Structures are given as C-alpha cells and as structure tokens.
C-alpha cells in the first residue's frame, strides 16, 4: 500500500493525476516490483469527483496504467469496507456520502460535491464557517470564539477571505474544519 495527496477529479484534475502517479511509484517501490510491470497490471481506481463515464475515460487516458478501470470512490469505499458482508457505510472526509450494500447491490446517497451537497463533510463545515464569518463581519450574527479565530486567520480582512474563497478547493475548505471544534 502507499499514500499520496488528495485526489478529487472534479475540483483538481491535474493534481489528481499527479497524486495517483506518485502513489503508483510508491506502490512499485514497496512491492519491490518494476514500475513498468506495475503499469501492466490490471487496476481499478475509485476516485473522488468521478461523475460521468467521460470523466473516468479522460482520467484513464492521462494515467500510465495500461489496463485501468475507474469509478467514483463511493463504490470502492463501500466494497472495501464491507467486503462480502451486507451493511452500511458513512463516508465523511473532504466530501460525504452514505451507502447501503445488500448482496451485490450498492445504493448510495450524497456525494454530490461541495457545490450541491456534501453536508457534514470537512469542506462543507469549513465553507459554512466562512459564510458565518461574513454574516458576523456584516453585523448580522453574533461573534463567537470560533468566528474570532477564523477571522483572525484572515487578519480580519474581507479581501483576504474573498481571495481565499475565490480559489478554494474542497480540501482548502476542509483544512478550516478543525478550528470549528
């Protein structure tokens, strides 16, 4: 096994490719297998942010793997966690989803991405906290220690907050979530 950085195809496709390639290099080293041999092996990747078959095909074309299937991470996470057993999985990280597995059937809810959902995820919590900061800064909500801490991170500067939000990825928002608790 190997780890690399975040991979969300919807929000950061180029970084997703880079991190998958980095992980492949680490896997070949940990298995004492030639990199070329690893790239010939069949692989199935569950990647956050894969929404359509076209997304999966485009990502596969940008990877060095010769026999690669790609799906969203909900299916692979559910099967990986439950194996052959029936059960439920709540996936909460940068995004969020709930899945139910019964026999060969897997049904999931959520996983819509930050633009439309991901309630309870780190990204959703971080973005919601910044939205609350804006309300407090405008005098429409009361100040709290959490809000003061977040505002302080941006030097109480509206411009810094807006600049951050303009380019923030779900992972950027999720990094704010620990300040909430």
Specify the residue positions occupied by each region the protein language model found.
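A mobile "lid/hinge" subdomain adjacent to the ATP/sugar-phosphate binding pocket shared
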Residues: 142-181
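Short beta-strand-loop/turn "lid" adjacent to the catalytic site in phosphate-handling enzymes
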Residues: 3-9, 28-70, 166
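Glycine-rich phosphate-binding loop plus the immediately following alpha-helix
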Residues: 108-153
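Stable alpha-helical structural segments in soluble proteins, enriched in small hydrophobic residues
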Residues: 16-34, 81
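Glycine/charged-rich beta-loop-alpha catalytic/anionic-binding loops adjacent to active sites
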Residues: 60-61, 66, 105-113
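Gly/Thr-rich phosphate-binding beta-strand-loop-beta motif of the actin/hexokinase/Hsp70
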Residues: 1, 87-102
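Conserved phosphate-binding catalytic cores of ATP/NTP-utilizing and phosphoryl-transfer enzymes
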Residues: 65-90, 104-105
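Short glycine-rich, Thr/Ser-proximal phosphate-binding strand/loop in the N-terminal lobe
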Residues: 1-18, 26, 106, 111
